[in-house]
Design a protein with these regions (language model features):
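TPR/TPR-like (Sel1-like) alpha-helical repeat modules
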Residues: 79-82, 111-112, 141-148, 169, ...
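Alpha-helical segment of the N-proximal tetratricopeptide repeat
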Residues: 9-48, 54-55, 61
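TPR alpha-solenoid repeat register
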Residues: 52, 85-86, 160, 194
Length: 202
């Protein structure tokens, strides 16, 4: 609310805050077209609101509008200096085959290292980008840097292991893929589609 009041004034800011709450509610329930309708007017009313730009970028990303999503998330980055949406922005560039920009974002994120979760997501996107360009070895090497046994794996560990197992399978290294899918299943049998992936590797 404070942010919206700062960019639109107290009265208008309160109205905008209610509208962005509606858009957030729709987004969280995967009603992306509804969220998009609400956000169109918000972008016009509060173009310098980071919260509006961020949510609009995320909605556009979820609906596969990569160029528009990248534009919004770049604006969010300019307004805040935040690394929060670097992985999503990088994945948008990856979808657009703007691989150099995706790699630059990964390097920024890696050097800043704002949080383990963000760096993990950025690493997954960067590895995927390298794989998309035919560099499976480079993609695998990048994710192997995060391959260490932990007593209580968190979601970020499982996501990186899954991405790496998928790359092993694509590279034809089925024993390593199987081992890593088994490690994920041991930590969380319901994670992703790990059961069906293991069945397909028998």
């Amino acid at each position: 609310v404070d942010e919206l009041e700062a960019v639109a004034g107290p009265l208008e800011g309160s109205k905008l805050a209610a509208r962005i709450a509606d858009a957030t509610y729709a987004y969280e329930r995967e009603r992306y077209q509804e969220a998009r309708r609400i956000l169109r007017s918000l972008v016009e009313s509060a173009p310098n609101s980071p919260a509006v730009r961020e949510l609009n970028g995320l909605v556009l990303y979820r609906t596969g509008q990569w160029a528009a999503a990248a534009k919004e998330l770049e604006r969010y980055r300019e307004l805040t200096g935040s690394y929060d949406q670097h992985p999503v922005l990088a994945d948008s560039y990856r979808a657009l085959r703007r691989y150099e920009e995706a790699e630059d974002l990964w390097q920024d994120l890696r050097e800043a290292s704002p949080s383990g979760d963000l760096v993990a997501e950025g690493r997954i996107v960067a590895a995927g980008s390298r794989a998309d360009q035919g560099d499976l070895t480079g993609a695998i090497n990048l994710l192997e840097k995060a391959l260490r046994r932990v007593n209580h794996p968190q979601e970020r560990h499982l996501r990186q292991w899954y991405a790496l197992a998928d790359l092993y399978e694509r590279a034809g290294d089925l024993p390593r893929a199987r081992d890593l899918f088994n490690r994920i299943a041991s930590a969380d049998p319901e994670a992703f589609d790990v059961r069906s992936r293991l069945r397909s590797l028998r």
